[in-house]
From Swiss-Prot:
The lineage of its organism: Archaea, Methanobacteriati, Methanobacteriota, Methanomada group, Methanococci. This is Putative nickel-responsive regulator. Its cofactor is Ni(2+). Transcriptional regulator. Belongs to the transcriptional regulatory CopG/NikR family. Keywords: DNA-binding, Metal-binding, Nickel, Transcription, Transcription regulation. One of its GO terms (molecular function) is DNA binding. Pfam families: NikR_C (PF08753), RHH_1 (PF01402). Signal peptide: none annotated. Ni(2+) binds at residues 80, 91, 93, 99. It comes from the Archaea. Binds 1 nickel ion per subunit. The keyword Transcription regulation applies.
């Protein structure tokens, strides 16, 4: 038997309600098993992102609450710190409270990962998705 630790987390009511619907829909035996599965998926994604090497091009998509204290200023300052990596940005208003920013990047994978981590860790950021590709000349034939 695997050793288990018991933890406690706080979640917004609507997030937990939506998670519980998925748990029921997918037929999980318990909320704990669904959370373990979600953590496994997160760990796999993290390992994949951090195994990337070499020259890459891609997008970093960010959804954030623009009412959150200084989030827009912080995201802009971080982007200015990586101006050699960032090719372009696109900003879109999703609704009254949320914006989406798509950052086009090209450069070393380690720098792209570092930028992604800094953007992800900001208060007010709801979701970040990194998509990377091998630049055209490096695509296997």
């Amino acid at each position: 038997m695997v050793d288990m630790d018991r933890i406690s987390i706080s979640l917004p009511t609507n997030l937990l309600a939506e998670f519980d619907e998925i748990i029921e829909e997918r037929g999980y035996a318990s909320r704990s098993e669904a959370i373990r599965d979600s953590i496994r998926d997160y760990l796999i994604k993290h390992k994949w992102i951090h195994s990337l090497e070499g020259d890459r091009a891609g997008t970093i998509s960010i959804i954030y609450d623009h009412h959150s204290t200084d989030v827009m200023e912080k995201l802009t300052n971080i982007q200015h710190d990586y101006e050699k990596l960032i090719v372009a940005t696109i900003h879109m208003h999703l609704d009254h409270d949320h914006c989406m920013e798509v950052v086009l990047v090209k450069g070393d994978a380690s720098d792209i990962k570092e930028l992604t981590d800094k953007l992800t860790s900001q208060k007010g950021v709801k979701q970040v998705k990194l998509t990377v590709m091998v630049p055209g000349g490096n695509i296997p034939q």
